[in-house]
Amino acid sequence: MATLPQHPPARQRIDLRPDRTERLLAGLAIVLLGFVLAALARGAADWGKLPGVLWLHLATMIATLGLTPAILWMPRGNRLHRGLGYAWVAALGLTAIDSFAIRTSSGALSAIHILSLVTLCALPALVITARRHDHVRHRRIVRGLVIGALLTAGFFTFPFDRMLGHWLFS
């Protein structure tokens, strides 16, 4: 009886092109970025009242929202994607860290800070999976961060009792 050679199983090629979900997430990031910029424009009269920590938070979030569509829509695995990915990780990480300096009116952390903690735990895994070329896990973490750290957290910045919501809807 013949035996088969013991070769490791061939790695299945992963299609790295943006799929429907990534195109949708990138589009939603653009929509959210538009709402943030519109709120900022409408609240220009109050800009002088904002502490630096809020400006840092807004700047890093705007950078993250702006980079998201570019990264999700562009070809993957090249230097540009890698460089923009590191910039995205840095901006999102700084946003998450900075969020702990932003408190409720009573000085407490809010439930949304749980997303900041999850984000800070997920970012190292995102970088590690990219460096290991583990495309499936990397893609899963990216989607989770875009949905949770960007879109969900961003959505909850627009209720009327929050600054951006007040500026946009008043």
What are the roles of these predicted feature ranges?
Residues 2-170:
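Alpha-helical membrane insertion/targeting regions
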